[in-house]
Amino acid sequence: SSNVTISWCEFLPASEDSVFFDTMMNAMKENPDNYPYYNHLLDAGMTDQQIYNYAYGQKKTHLLGQSDTDTSAKNITVTLANNYYKDSMDRMPRLRFGTAHVYNCIMDAQDLRNMRLDIQNTVGSAFSQKIVSNGASSNCGAHMLLENCYMSGMTNALISGNGDSEAGYINAFNTMYLLDGKE
């Protein structure tokens, strides 16, 4: 595909009315034997609220290009404009091959970072490390330009290459980056 535009969207964690998360938490409390990881988190010292927060963030947002070896996306051209990302852990976006222009976007993961730090201070880094903190990622020779964006709360705001993925090209202009309220 080419000339794909995703604009004026909000990408938010959980459900707005929290019905899904309340149902999930109630099911775990009522049937703890069916949820060993939940029990493990409690045994490690996490509170129900911390577990709720642990599950709250959106893990992955945009992936463009399905794998490092499938080059079918090499001609993709995408524009992400005027979008709002709240408490996403990764892929705002992640691009393999192709070209992306990201502008006038707000990527705010500070609340999620605060949750991660709270969990780390309570039960250690083994659990908090599962809350990743990545922003935009360019891989496999992709080209990405970010302009006039606001990025907050991400340890790795801009990434070229990710894991075993080859590097791509990524550049940001007029983009503000804050971590814990500091530029």
Which residue stretches match the model-derived regions?
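Glycine- and acidic/polar-rich repeat regions and solenoidal domains
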Residues: 1-182
